[in-house]
Swiss-Prot record:
Its EC number is 3.4.23.36. It catalyses: Release of signal peptides from bacterial membrane prolipoproteins. Hydrolyzes -Xaa-Yaa-Zaa-|-(S,diacylglyceryl)Cys-, in which Xaa is hydrophobic (preferably Leu), and Yaa (Ala or Ser) and Zaa (Gly or Ala) have small, neutral side chains. It is found in: Cell inner membrane. This is Lipoprotein signal peptidase. Coiled coil: none annotated.
Length: 165
């Protein structure tokens, strides 16, 4: 499979899985009325409407802020997509695809709902992680992949990480 097709397929799969889980939890499972749903002693499903970015930073409560975040996500996805089109490494295109799919998934939420629907809450004892969704997990996994690719690229001395690579 050509690298670009692999990256685009990864982005599409991430987007579809993200939106399917959100629609399923909102419409079919009626999570807003049933929350919290305990999955395990350390995991539950809840409803959080995130008007900010990662970890709730930069909360935007105005329409201007909402649309600025949508615009930033679209521009970032386009830039990463352009990088993906020129990338040769499988890990690089997979990582970029995860990030693009996650960014677009969260942008769809902002357009449809005015905020991002987060629902997975992990916790143990007094420790609690931020509530997140499939798109967020894709973005984090993609960034981790970029870090691994950077280390491998440096070790190989190649140009796989450069956008013109």
């Amino acid at each position: 499979m050509r690298p670009l097709i692999l990256g685009l397929a990864t982005a599409a799969a991430t987007l579809v899985l993200d939106q399917a889980t959100k629609l399923g939890l909102l419409l079919l499972a009626d999570l807003p009325a049933r929350q919290p749903v305990v999955l395990a002693p350390f995991a539950q499903l809840v409803v959080v409407w995130n008007r900010g970015v990662s970890y709730g930073l930069f909360q935007q409560h105005t329409e201007l802020g909402r649309w600025l975040l949508v615009g930033v996500a679209v521009l970032a996805a386009a830039a990463l997509g352009a990088w993906m089109a020129r990338a040769g490494s499988r890990l690089l295109v997979l990582s970029l695809g995860l990030i693009v799919g996650g960014a677009v998934g969260n942008a769809v939420d902002r357009v449809a709902y005015g905020a991002v629907f987060d629902f997975v809450h992990l916790h143990a004892g007094g420790w609690s992680w931020y509530v997140f969704n499939v798109a967020d997990a894709g973005i984090v996994a993609g960034v981790a992949g970029l870090l691994v690719e950077t280390v491998w690229s440096e070790a190989r001395g190649d140009a796989a990480m450069r956008p013109d690579g």
